[in-house]
């Protein structure tokens, strides 16, 4: 590629790096926006430690809380073909490689490794770092679902030098 094309690719990669979020080493959690203030951070933290899967469902004050288990990973939210994809980066050589994969139907032909069924009271959710109380969380990503009940399928994408965990909310 020309020098200008290479510089352009670098700028695109730097721009796309801003689309990924990370925690301070604790899991991300997802809860309905109307109940998010009930999350007390350290006070509730032991409850999420019981989750050993990539995605687990627990209850705080009788409300569903989803926990992204395993190890903390850089995460990106993508809306694709009517589904919300939560992409978690295990490893890849660079951002551009992952971005190219996301242009296609990345989970096509892959069997889910986990499924979680969830019934919410509303369609407005928020994803945030579980370490802090919700009001102090530095990263908050708001999600809008099509309906209050959904199935979340988890896929392990592993090819060549790329490994991603993908949660598809349908």
What is the predicted function of each stretch?
Residues 141:
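Phosphate-end processing signature that detects enzymes handling 5′-triphosphorylated RNA
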Residues 145-147:
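Surface-exposed coil/turn segments at beta-strand junctions on protein surfaces, enriched
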Residues 123, 159-160:
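Beta-strand-connecting loop/turn residues
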Residues 150-152:
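A short tyrosine-centered beta-strand micro-motif
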Residues 102-138:
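Extended, solvent-exposed segments with strong compositional bias
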Residues 1-15:
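N-terminal amphipathic/basic-hydrophobic helices that include classical n-h-c signal peptides
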């Amino acid at each position: 590629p020309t020098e200008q094309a290479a510089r352009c690719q670098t700028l695109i990669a730097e721009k796309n790096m801003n689309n990924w979020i990370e925690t301070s080493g604790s899991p991300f959690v997802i809860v309905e926006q109307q109940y998010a203030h009930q999350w007390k951070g350290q006070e509730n933290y032991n409850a999420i430690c019981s989750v050993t899967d990539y995605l687990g469902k627990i209850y705080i004050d009788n409300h569903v809380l989803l926990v992204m288990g395993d190890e903390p990973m850089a995460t990106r939210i993508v809306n694709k073909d009517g589904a919300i994809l939560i992409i978690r980066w295990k490893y890849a050589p660079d951002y551009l490689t992952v971005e190219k994969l996301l242009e296609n139907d990345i989970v096509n032909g892959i069997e889910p490794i986990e499924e979680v069924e969830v019934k919410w009271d509303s369609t407005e959710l928020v994803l945030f770092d579980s370490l802090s109380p919700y009001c102090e969380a530095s990263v908050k990503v708001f999600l809008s679902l099509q309906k209050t009940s959904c199935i979340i399928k988890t896929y392990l994408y592993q090819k060549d030098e790329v490994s991603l965990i993908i949660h598809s909310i349908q």
